[in-house]
UniProtKB/Swiss-Prot annotation:
Belongs to the XseA family. It is found in: Cytoplasm. Bidirectionally degrades single-stranded DNA into large acid-insoluble oligonucleotides, which are then degraded further into small acid-soluble oligonucleotides. This is Exodeoxyribonuclease 7 large subunit. Its main location: cytoplasm. GO terms for biological process: DNA catabolic process. Its EC number is 3.1.11.6. Keywords: Cytoplasm, Exonuclease, Hydrolase, Nuclease. Heterooligomer composed of large and small subunits. The keyword Transport does not apply. GO terms for cellular component: cytoplasm; exodeoxyribonuclease VII complex. It comes from Bacillus cereus (strain AH187). CDD domains: ExoVII_LU_OBF.
Length: 452
């Protein structure tokens, strides 16, 4: 019988079909530790689940992981529900997770702690960014459910404390999957309106699941970005949500939020009354001081003898005018003198004057130079004549005029001794008026007496 060989693809698909048709492998509950966690840009999660002795690849697609509240991390122990299948490209089996929650810690509690740490690290809880709640808000916006005790408590408290204030209610869902987007949209709408001085965002008490919308990241970031100051009022006094940490001010209850947003009109009236009394008292004191000053002025010389005072002032004015005229004349004289001095200085230092002085100096120098040059030439001329006379006395030509001559060999060297030539050598004899070409036919040596 001939053997049939399977392809790798065929074998892998066969194994995959066997696994996927096994009902025990289509609804598997596992617990393990996350490692090699990767969050794909498309939202899918890829990681490994492991225990002390084994490991399995895990995939959680975006459609399923968007429902989990916490962020999976390496080292986290989790409980998962999914189905087993084979990834044909690698031939490996893996679990496709449909639900996941932390092992030992509540899903919502872990998500709360993770988001709290992350937002705090980003600075969203910092006091630096907290806006001041206005003390006398004219218009108060309320973002909460249109039904329930919270809205009634807020409106009742505001109207009781501050009946002249305006209240604008932005009805929203406060629990369920659509609650967070509803709250975010209401905050944006309020910020787009004009005239709202402060916002109250909150709801009545409830379980962590019921209050969860106020722990959503989108709500926290919307509160942080709000240009209008926000007072959070979520649940009871012991309930703390992420919104409470981000808000500009936290109120323990909705009623307390209304008291923080709206001033007490009775207290305001008391303040106005006290300030009115202080103002009236200050005005009475001011009027009394002015009356006393008026009485003093009425008793003064100016009030009793106004004509004399007028005449005195008129006389003072005349004198002041005279002094002004004299001062003006002195000032003009002073400036005229300064102008004359400047004119004299300018005339003295005028360029034409300077040129004339320079021209005279140059002419003087030229004459001096000519005299010195003439003297120098005369001195040089006298020295030249003396040198010429001395040179003439020492000149060989002068000696030649007395019958002497100079004898040269063929190389035109002056012969100083008979030893410098031989018989038959050609020599030249230079006389005063010419040169003789001669030949040596005889040599007669003489002894020099005393070297002469």
């Amino acid at each position: 019988m001939e053997k049939q060989y399977l392809t790798v693809t065929a074998l892998t698909r066969y194994i995959k079909t066997k696994i996927e048709y096994d009902p025990h492998l289509q609804s598997v509950w596992l617990k393990g530790e996350i490692s090699n966690f990767k969050n794909h840009s498309r939202g899918h999660m890829y990681f490994t689940l492991k225990d002390e002795n084994a490991r399995i690849a895990a995939v959680m697609f975006a459609g399923h992981n968007r429902n989990i509240k916490f962020r999976p991390e390496n080292g986290m122990k989790v409980l998962v529900k999914g189905k087993i299948s084979v990834y044909e490209a690698s031939g490996s089996y893996q679990i496709y997770i449909q639900d996941m929650q932390p092992d030992g810690v509540g899903n919502l509690h872990l998500a709360y702690e993770q988001l709290k740490v992350r937002l705090e690290e980003e600075g969203l809880f910092s006091q630096v960014y907290k806006k001041t709640i206005p003390p006398y808000a004219k218009t108060i916006g309320v973002i909460t459910s249109p039904t329930g005790a919270a809205i009634r408590d807020i409106i009742t408290t505001i109207k009781r404390r501050y009946p002249i204030g305006n209240v604008i209610v932005f009805p929203v869902l406060v629990q369920g999957e659509s609650a967070a987007p509803s709250i975010v949209q209401a905050i944006r709408t309020a910020n787009e309106m004009e005239g709202i001085d402060v916002l109250i965002v909150g709801r009545g008490g409830g379980s962590i699941e019921e209050l969860w919308a106020f722990n959503e990241e989108m709500v926290a970031r919307a509160i942080f970005k709000s240009e209008i100051p926000i007072i959070s009022a979520v649940g009871h006094e012991t309930d703390f949500t992420i919104a409470d940490f981000v808000a500009d001010l936290r109120a323990p209850t909705p009623t307390a939020a209304a008291e923080l947003a709206a001033p007490n009109i009775i207290e305001l009236q008391e303040k106005v009354l006290q300030r009115t009394l202080r103002l009236q008292r200050a005005m009475r004191e001011l009027v009394h001081k002015k009356e006393e000053k008026l009485q003093v002025l009425q008793k003064s010389y100016a009030f009793r003898y106004p004509r004399q005072v007028y005449e005195q002032k008129e006389e003072q004015l005349d004198r002041a005018l005279e002094q002004l005229v004299l001062a003006k004349e002195r000032y003009i004289d002073k400036k005229v003198n300064q102008l004359k001095q400047l004119s004299f200085y300018l005339e003295k230092h005028h360029p034409s004057q300077k040129i004339m002085q320079t021209k005279v100096a140059v002419e003087t120098l030229q004459k001096q130079l000519q005299r010195e040059m003439q003297t120098l030439l005369q001195t040089k001329e006298f020295a030249f004549v003396r040198a010429a006379q001395k040179l003439e006395a020492l000149s060989p030509l002068k000696v030649m005029m007395r019958g002497y001559g100079l004898v040269y060999d063929e190389e035109k060297q002056v012969l100083k001794s008979v030893k410098d030539v031989s018989l038959g050598d050609a020599v030249s004899v230079q006389l005063q008026d010419g040169i003789l070409d001669c030949s040596v036919s005889g040599i007669e040596e003489r002894e020099l007496n005393n070297g002469k």
